A protein has these predicted regions:
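Active-site and donor-binding regions of nucleotide-sugar-utilizing enzymes
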Residues: 1-99, 199, 209-212, 227-228
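Donor nucleotide-activated moiety binding/catalytic core segment of transferases
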Residues: 7-8, 168-229
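Glycine-rich phosphate-binding loop signature in dinucleotide/nucleotide-binding domains
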Residues: 8-12, 113-115, 216
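Structural motif
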Residues: 13-14, 61, 119, 153, ...
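Redox-cofactor binding/interface segments in oxidoreductases and associated redox assembly factors
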Residues: 17, 64, 122, 156, ...
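Residue-level marker of alpha-helix boundaries and capping positions
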Residues: 18-19, 61, 130-133, 168, ...
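Catalytic cores of nucleotide-enabled group-transfer and carboxylate-activating enzymes in metabolic
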Residues: 70, 104-105, 221
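Conserved catalytic-core segment of nucleotide-activated headgroup transferases in glycan assembly
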Residues: 93-194
Length: 231
């Protein structure tokens, strides 16, 4: 198998994966099942128990966020309810502990924000689900016109898909957003930071950025995004 060398070297007592056997995880979990090593999956996303719940390997245990997710696993994918444990959302513990939070002045300085203006943040979603640009442009015009009850500014967080050059709609909208930043005052874009290699740019793992944006925004606007759950 693909992971024979690792199993031979470490001889694990248990194998835990963040999916029930998608992509490369399926080979890891299949190898553990073949060797008779106990295994389990940890549900990490709000929609994983409903949209991606079919196992790609023989998985013994699952831990999920809530009673609703457990119901989705049991009724939607025939999991044995005795093998599904409700364990909360460990990946969000850092939000409650505030371990990722930057100081406000440091965050505002990072994005050239005005500390005296209210902050409206827009978290983009998949372009092919709903174009972001019409919403962003409307907000950009609004904060730049000073027609709101209080002086405000707009911070735009692009979606990881914006950094793909194919299909072209991703790159086109990315270009539109950066042009908008040049055109209007009080409009700022979270600058993309390369994650290294083929990993692309900021996505789900830039916790300092995400948690600070949500903590210091007066309003967060998004359409069909996991950011709704995190907010």
């Amino acid at each position: 198998g693909l992971y024979n060398d690792l199993f031979d070297k470490y001889n694990p007592d248990m194998v835990i994966a963040s999916t029930p056997g998608w992509r490369m995880d399926r080979y890891l979990l299949r190898e553990s099942a073949r060797r008779g090593i106990p295994n389990m999956t940890v549900i990490v996303g709000w929609d994983n128990s409903s949209s991606y719940n079919v196992s790609g390997a023989d998985v013994q245990w699952a831990t999920c966020w809530s009673e609703l997710q457990k119901e989705e696993l049991v009724k939607g994918s025939d999991w044995n309810p005795e093998q599904v444990i409700i364990g909360g959302i460990p990946s969000y513990d850092g939000y409650f502990r505030k371990q990722w939070l930057m100081p406000r002045d440091e965050y505002f300085k990072l994005h050239n924000l005005d500390p005296n203006r209210k902050l409206i943040s827009y978290a983009s979603s998949f372009v092919h689900f709903a174009p972001n640009f019409p919403n962003i442009e409307a907000l950009a015009k609004l904060v730049s016109s000073d027609e709101l009850a209080e002086p405000s500014q707009l911070l735009i967080r692009l979606h990881p898909s914006h950094f793909q050059d194919k299909p072209k709609i991703f790159a086109d909208e990315r270009t539109q957003v950066f042009e908008l930043e040049k055109k209007y005052p009080h409009v700022h874009v979270v600058q993309p930071v390369a994650l290294g290699g083929s990993l692309g740019y900021y996505g789900g793992e830039d916790m300092d950025e995400k948690s600070s944006m949500m903590a210091y925004s007066d309003v967060v606007v998004t359409v069909y995004s996991t950011m709704l759950v995190e907010t």
